[in-house]
Amino acid sequence: MTNTFTFNAKIKQINSHLPLFPENLDSFWDKEIKPLFTDESLSFMVKTLNGNYVKYVNLDNGATTTPFASVKQYVDQMLDTYGSVHRGSGQKSVITTQEYDASRNMIRDFVGSSSQNYVIFAKNTTEAINGAATLWAKKPGKILVSDIEHSSNLLPWITRDEFVQYRTQPDGSVSLSEIENIFKAHHNRSKGEQIKLLTITGASTITGYRPPIYEIAALAHRYGAKMFADVCQLIQHERVDMRPDDDPCHLDFVAFSGHKMYAPYGTGVLLGPKEFFDSSYPYQIGGGNLPYITRNLEIKRFYTERAHDPGTPNAMGAIAIAKSIQIIEALERSRIAQYEHSLVEFTFTRLQNIPGVKVYILGDNLAHVIPFDIDGFDGRLVAEILAQEYGIGVRAGAFCTYEYIRKLKNISDEQDLEIAKEVETGITRNIPSIIRASFAVYNTLEDCDRLINAIAQIAKNGFDYYLPYYTQDEITGVWTVTDR
C-alpha cells in the first residue's frame, strides 16, 4: 500500500473543512474497518478481459454500499424468528414487533430528532420524499427547490405543487443572500404565494458538495417556512443533527435510505413533526394503518406513526438500519468522515496531475465523491474500461442531476434543446455524462492507487486506442466489449 508519510506530505497543502486523519490509514483499516465486513465482500474477485482475476475495487458507493457483516448476520438470525408486525399475539410476532419499534427510537437518536417527530419507513428515499411532497401539496404556499437536486428531491415537488426554483452559482454552490432575496420577494404576498417549505440536498450525488443546511434552515425559519433536507448522500459519511425544535437551525424534515449506509433490504426513512403528519390522511392507506371503518364507511384513524405503516412493513429493512447505526456510532462518524476525506484528498491531488484529466469538484469542499472526465473520452466508455480491464467499479452518467451537470459541462441552451429533441425520439446517447468515483469506509489507499494508475494509463492510451475493442449503442450510448 501507499506510504502514509508520503501521502500526508502530499495533501498537507489542500484546505479542507475536515482535519487530516490523525492515525495511520492502513493500520486503522486493518484493525477497525476490515473486521466489520465479510472476507468474501472485501476480497471479491472479478475476471478482466485478459483472463486474469483481480480483486474488485468498489468505487460506486454513492449508489449503494456493501452491508456490514454483523448486520447481515443479525438479519439472517432474525429471519428464524420473523413474524408479522403489529398483527399477532404469537411469540414470533411479538419479537419482530419489538425489534421493529425499537429501530424507530434508534433512528430518532441517530439524527438528533425531537421526540415530537415521527419516524416513518418507506421503500427508499424516493418514496419517502414522494410521501412528504404529497402531504405538503395539500397546504397553501410554494416549495423552494434548488437546481442541483437529484430527481428524487425535485420531481416529487414540482409535479405536485406550486414551486420556485432558485439558481445556484455556476459551480453549483449556494448563495444565502440570493435565497433570502427569494424569501423577501414572497414574504408579504398572499398565503398561497409565500414560501412554505425549502428543500435541498445535504450532499450532492454528483460532486459531494454540501450546502450549509443549518444556515439555510435558520433562513427559512426566519421567514416562516419549514426546512426539508435530503441527506441520503450525507448521513453515512458525516453526522446529521436535526437539532431541538427551538433551535433556529433545526431541520424540520430529513429523508435517507439504509442501503447507502451499509444496511441491506432497501428501507427509506422520513422524519418530521407529528402535527404535520397528523393533519391529513397518510400518503398511502390500506390494511392496518386505518384501524376501523364503520358500516357507513366512516374511517377511524390512528394519530401515531403506525398510521403511516400501511400493509406489512419491511421489518427486516428497518431492523438492518438500526443495527448499522450501532456500528457507525461505535466507529464514530467523525473518524469515518476524516478517514474517507483523507482518501479523497489523496486521489484528488493525484488525478489533477494526470494530463487530460479534468476534475469537477470544489477544492475546498471535498467530500466522498470525485467527479471527473478524460479529454476526448465519453465517460461511459471510461467506466466500462475500468470495469472490464481493471476490475474497478465506478459510475458514469448524469446521476439524475441534469441542471447541475449542464452547469459543470457548460451545456448551452441550444445543446440542451437538441438533446431534449433526441430524447423525445428515444435517443439518449448524447445526454451529458461525468465519471463518478464515490468512496466508502471500506475503501483503502490501495484502491485509490489502482484507480489513479488506471486513469493515467487510459488517458495515455487515448480514445482511438480503444475503438477496436468497444462498441457504442447508437440509441442508448452504452459501451460494450466488441465481440472478438
Where are these regions (language model features)?
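Pyridoxal 5′-phosphate
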Residues: T2-R484
